[in-house]
Amino acid sequence: MASDNLVVLNALDTARTQWYHVTAVIIAGMGFFTDAYDLFCISTVSKLLGRLYYYDPSTKAPGKLPHMANNWVIGVALVGTLSGQLVFGWLGDKLGRKKVYGLTLILMVICALCSGLSLGYSPKSVIGTLCFFRFWLGFGIGGDYPLSATIMSEYANKSTRGAFIAAVFAMQGVGIIFAGLVSMTISKVFLMNFEGKPFNVDEVLSTEPEADYVWRIVLMLGALPALLTYYWRMKMPETGRYTAIIEGNAKQAAIDMGKVLDIEIQAEGDKLAQFKAANEYSLLSNEFFQRHGLHLIGTMSTWFLLDIAFYSQNLTQKDIFPVMGLTSKANTISALREMFETSRAMFVIALFGTFPGYWFTVFFIEKIGRFKIQLVGFFMMSVFMAIIGVKYDYLRNKEHKWTFAALYGLTFFFANFGPNSTTFVLPAELFPTRVRSTCHALSAALGKAGAMISAFGIQQYTQDQDVRKIKTAMLLLAFTNMVGFCCTFLVTETKGRSLEEISGEDGRQNETQMKTTRPVSGHPDDGWE
């Protein structure tokens, strides 16, 4: 009820949607644009790196990254992301969201630029330098996950909060599209001026020397969106919930949020003690486990399982495209042509499969709810991956390539109109202000642990384009999604409720506590909602 809440928090919950909410989505969302661009553009350039630095004339085949080098080039940013999520998530609760929010962008800008540099021209020096800077790039990207989600959830009104958080995350879809588009455009420009011969015509001249500039330009352009939003991110005030509930300064919260919402909010201190008392327990306390333990297990497990499947799809699609017939065989084209075709296929799949799913979530999350979207998404992903795995021999024939592409695209669609979006939204809503950023970070970090399994494990099944291994990988991912479907029952629906009502910060019991105190009879008058 509104009367149980602080005036400033009630003002945030009931405020009409206005321009400031939109700018907050853009400012926070550009971090995810950068995140997706930087993490996924490596898929478009990794084959080029192999042809440039690992060509062996004795093999009579185009150069490709050794398994270990390939895993580290792709996976090291995920290791950095996991580390950054934990560090910045904790700092966001201890120091405040705003104080550490700009540092993530600084890391992204510097390390994206440095990713295009290398110390020397030997394979070890180039790959070693690239991995070093991509780790710290991932570290900055990781910090953006808990901070952006928490800031958006604490700024938004309760009727559109899920849509706003999902819109921030949907910028990841835009970033994935641009990763393909930019790679495609730059490689095409170089092709128009420096195209080499097909590999089966001339093994040496098929790898254009100018291609060494292409991958560097693609990676360095990832700094641009982060750089453009740094000033506006620094102009954002601390969230009213953190200022009021954690810092105990209801007056400053009222001033800051009054400016943001362009309304006058009365400062209120008499209810502040109630909220601070409800927030005193720590993350490792028995009280936290009783109140929120199942929810934390639910958000961590579902994000972990989702990212095994989602990152496996994104990071290995470059290996599956030739099997689908969407790109030419490597030994029939030049290095730049291979990058162009891989980028084009990635762009098409993202545009028609990945991108729409994000925005379906934005438009329907407040109507259908987080819980149902996540359940259906996990289930449909499992169905389509199982079909691909079982019918793989049939689908890999060239005459069925568009059926294959449609099924593959639908798995992306239901990942994003499903658990890839909702696993980001739910941890930003389920937990109390004092530990909200940390709990989101823990959930996201488990997700990146799943992504690391895909980068260092699942890729072993697809990199050699072995039919039996790819079938095994798809069936394994289908099973993983069904486990995620089951783990979804550990979380609860959050739509239409204030953050304080969901977490029990307003002095009332949250849903986990209600389950332990509801009477067996279950009559409405006996305490059921």
Curated annotation (Swiss-Prot):
Record: glycosylation sites: N314
CDD domains, per database record: MFS_PhT
GO CC, one annotated term: periarbuscular membrane
Region ranges (Disordered): 501-529
Entry keywords, A to Z: Cell membrane, Glycoprotein, Membrane, Phosphate transport, Symport, Transmembrane, Transmembrane helix, Transport
GO process terms (BP): arbuscular mycorrhizal association; phosphate ion transport; response to symbiotic fungus
InterPro entries in the cross-refs: MFS_dom (IPR020846), MFS_sugar_transport-like (IPR005828), MFS_trans_sf (IPR036259)
Residue ranges, Extracellular side: 43-71, 121-125, 183-211, 313-344, 396-405, 459-471
Family: Belongs to the major facilitator superfamily. Phosphate:H(+) symporter (TC 2.A.1.9) family.
The name this protein goes by in its record: Low affinity inorganic phosphate transporter 4
Inducers of expression: Regulated positively by RAM1 during arbuscular mycorrhiza (AM) formation after inoculation with AM fungi (e.g. Rhizophagus irregularis and Glomus intraradices).
PROSITE patterns: MFS (PS50850)
Annotated compartments: Cell membrane
Spans traversing the lipid bilayer: 22-42, 72-92, 100-120, 126-146, 162-182, 212-232, 292-312, 345-365, 375-395, 406-426, 438-458, 472-492
Cytoplasmic compartment spans: 1-21, 93-99, 147-161, 233-291, 366-374, 427-437, 493-529
The species this protein was found in: Petunia hybrida
The reaction(s) this protein catalyses: phosphate(in) + H(+)(in) = phosphate(out) + H(+)(out)
Principal location: membrane
Topology of this chain in the membrane: Multi-pass membrane protein
Keyword Cell division on entry: no
One annotated GO molecular function: symporter activity
Note: Although related to the sugar transporter family, it does not transport sugars.
Skewed-composition ranges (Polar residues): 510-519
Function: Low-affinity transporter for external inorganic phosphate (Pi) probably involved in the acquisition of phosphate released by arbuscular mycorrhizal (AM) fungi (e.g. Rhizophagus irregularis and Glomus intraradices) during AM symbiosis. Acts as a Pi-sensing machinery at the root tip level, independently of AM fungi, involved in the regulation of early root branching and lateral roots formation.
